Amino acid sequence: MKAGVVHAKNDIRFEEIKTPVPEKGQVLVKVKYTGICGSDVPRVNGDACHFFPNVLGHEFSGVVETVGEGVSSLKPGDRVAGVPLVPCMECEDCRKGNYSLCKHYSFIGSREFGSFAEYVAVPEKNAVKFEDSVSFEQGAFFEPATVALHGLLRTGYQGGEDVAVLGGGTIGLFTAQWAKIFGAKRVTVFDISDERLKLAKKLSIDNGINTLEEDF
C-alpha cells in the first residue's frame, strides 16, 4: 500500500509499504479521509516523533476491509471513524474507566502506524461505526469534535451562558459550535486570523474578534 512515511526529522516520503494484516480483535480499515492535526507538525519537523520510520495520522474515517479473529461488532463494508487512544485496560486508571490517564497507552498515528496510508489496522473498539447519512469527510472530524466537547464539558459549562473561545482553529471552532448546540447565550471567538474568523461567522458563531486589530 502507499503511505506517507516519516523517516527522520523533516523527512516524510510517499512510498510503498506492507499492508497490515488485522490481528485478533482488530479490523483493517481502508482510509477514505484523514486530517492533519497540529500535533502532527512537530512529529515531522520537530522532535516529537516516537520512532522512525513512522506513519502518522489519527483523525480518519474509512471502510472496514477485513476483520481479525474474534471481532463481532463490525463487518467488511461498515463505515467507521477512528479513535486513536489505545488504553492498556489493565492499569489502575483503566480499571476505573479513566482511559485518558492510562500509564501504558498506545496511540494510533504516533506510537503505532496511523492513517496517512491506504490502510490502517486498529482494535475493534477503536473503530466507531457511523450511518450512511454521515459523509466520510464528516466522519474524519469525529476525533477533533470529541476533543472539543470534552474540553467544554470539563469547564462545567451551563447552557444560557456567554462563551469566549480563545483561538479559532479546528478545536476552537468545534468548541464554539458545541457551545451553540448546548444553548450558549452568545459565543465569541478570538483569533488573529481573519480567515478563521470568517469561517466562524459562516458556522453561525455570534461574534469574532481579531485581537491584533480590536481593543476588547
Model-derived segments and their meaning:
Residues 2, 26-28, 162:
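Residues that mark the start of a beta-strand
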Residues 7, 18-19, 51-57, 108-112:
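Short Gly/Pro-enriched turn/cap motifs at secondary-structure boundaries
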Residues 20-34, 47-92, 131-134:
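Glycine-rich beta-strand-centered segment in the early N-terminal region that forms part
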Residues 39-43:
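Cytochrome P450 core scaffold surrounding the K-helix E-X-X-R motif
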Residues 88-166:
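NAD(P)H dinucleotide-binding glycine-rich loop of Rossmann-like/cofactor-binding domains
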Residues 135-213:
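Mid-domain Rossmann-like dinucleotide-binding core that forms the NAD(H)/NADP(H) cofactor-binding site
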